[in-house]
Design a protein with these regions (language model features):
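Active-site-adjacent structural elements in folded domains
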Residues: 107-110, 157
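Residue-level detector of conserved catalytic or cofactor/ligand-binding positions
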Residues: 150-156
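Glycine- and small hydrophobic-enriched segments that form the cores of compact globular domains
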Residues: 85, 115-119, 131
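Conserved phosphate/anionic-ligand binding catalytic regions in large, soluble enzymes, centered on
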Residues: 110-125
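Beta-strand segments within the central parallel beta-sheet cores of soluble alpha/beta enzyme folds
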Residues: 136-148
Length: 157
């Protein structure tokens, strides 16, 4: 993307009277030579991978070292038993972050955004929003465009 900061992209979106996600999409299309349909298809695929990582979580699976695995299920169980701090959303975010990290450690699906160390952050925030009905798939994909700007501009700040 030709924008080096979120501030620049926000200014561009405001000046064109379009959403931030639309401005990011347009910038990406101008640089990538992708069609809008293909770009959106790729975002939907990323979202589907995040969903599959959660859906296919196996609490019995362990990493090769045996150090990682099963913790997301423990968090979910503690919440169901009323032993967790925070509300439903915080418990869901915590469990989803662990599911993704454990899936990465077990070499199933790799969700690296922007690195494997932060792999669970995006799915952790987005999956509970989608499940609660607070965000539909298009809104999630728009959020992924915005998050891509943050990822791209962060190293330059």
């Amino acid at each position: 993307m030709s924008f080096l900061s979120c501030e620049e992209m926000l200014a561009a979106a405001r000046s064109q009277n379009i959403s931030l996600s639309e401005a990011i999409l347009r910038s990406d299309l101008a640089e990538s030579r992708l069609t809008e349909a293909h770009s959106r298809e790729m975002m939907h695929h990323l979202w589907q991978v995040m969903q599959a990582t959660s859906r296919d979580y196996d609490p019995a699976q362990r990493s090769r070292s045996g150090l990682s695995g099963g913790d997301a299920a423990k968090v979910e169980q503690a919440h169901q038993e009323g032993k967790s701090l925070g509300g439903d959303y915080l418990a869901a975010v915590t469990a989803e972050a662990l599911k993704t990290a454990e899936c990465n450690a077990c070499m199933k699906r790799i969700v690296a955004a922007p690195t494997a160390g932060s792999c669970g952050v995006l799915p952790a925030v987005l999956l509970p929003l989608a499940r609660s009905g607070e965000a539909d798939e298009e809104s999630i994909c728009d959020a992924l465009y915005v998050l891509s700007l943050i990822h791209i501009s962060e190293p330059t700040r």
